[in-house]
């Protein structure tokens, strides 16, 4: 997690990856909100969102960074091999985990429970429970949207923090 009080020098790739990361949350919010109405299209965009976030992740601890990146990669592999439920699970693991991380920056109410909400969303998808899917897609989508708005309101360097703390 970045230290907002530290402003490390940023190059073009730093700016680009922060923009990609934040855009991922916008895409995720819209895709999750529509998942019960347009499941195939939403799944594609949820995977795109998770890829944006995981590919451009600025987190100090290498183990968590790799966990979120590999969950997304595995989700993408399941997607191209026609296992949509498992693909969705990998993407939601990444997005839910990142929301939990971001909770400690913003203290958005209920954001720390996002991993539980996306797990319920996933189970609703797998069990084909449309009512539960709509409920959890609205809860998760709104939380992602609030997070996306909060992220875009702050300076880009807040996502980077102290570059000397990153585990390589």
Swiss-Prot record:
<keyword id="KW-0472">Membrane</keyword>
<keyword id="KW-1133">Transmembrane helix</keyword>
<feature type="transmembrane region" description="Helical">
    <location>
        <begin position="15"/>
        <end position="33"/>
    </location>
</feature>
<dbReference type="InterPro" id="IPR019275">
    <property type="entry name" value="DUF2301"/>
</dbReference>
<dbReference type="Pfam" id="PF10063">
    <property type="entry name" value="DUF2301"/>
</dbReference>
<dbReference type="GO" id="GO:0005886">
    <property type="term" value="C:plasma membrane"/>
</dbReference>
<protein>
    <recommendedName>
        <fullName>Uncharacterized protein HI_0120</fullName>
    </recommendedName>
</protein>
<feature type="transmembrane region" description="Helical">
    <location>
        <begin position="129"/>
        <end position="149"/>
    </location>
</feature>
<keyword id="KW-0812">Transmembrane</keyword>
<feature type="transmembrane region" description="Helical">
    <location>
        <begin position="73"/>
        <end position="93"/>
    </location>
</feature>
<keyword id="KW-1003">Cell membrane</keyword>
<feature type="transmembrane region" description="Helical">
    <location>
        <begin position="41"/>
        <end position="57"/>
    </location>
</feature>
<feature type="transmembrane region" description="Helical">
    <location>
        <begin position="108"/>
        <end position="128"/>
    </location>
</feature>
């Amino acid at each position: 997690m970045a230290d907002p009080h530290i402003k490390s020098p940023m190059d073009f790739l730093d700016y680009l990856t922060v923009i990609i990361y934040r855009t991922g949350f916008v895409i995720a919010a819209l895709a999750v909100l529509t998942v019960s109405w347009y499941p195939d299209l939403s799944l594609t965009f949820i995977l795109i969102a998770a890829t944006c976030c995981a590919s451009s992740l600025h987190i100090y601890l290498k183990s968590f960074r790799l966990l979120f990146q590999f969950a997304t990669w595995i989700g993408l592999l399941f997607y191209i091999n026609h296992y949509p439920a498992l693909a969705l699970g990998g993407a939601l693991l990444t997005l839910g985990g990142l929301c939990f991380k971001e909770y400690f920056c913003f203290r958005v109410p209920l954001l720390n429970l996002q991993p539980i909400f996306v797990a319920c969303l996933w189970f609703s998808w797998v069990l084909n429970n449309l009512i539960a899917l709509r409920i959890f897609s609205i809860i998760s989508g709104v939380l992602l949207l609030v997070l996306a708005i909060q992220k875009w309101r702050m300076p880009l360097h807040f996502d980077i923090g102290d570059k000397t703390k990153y585990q390589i």
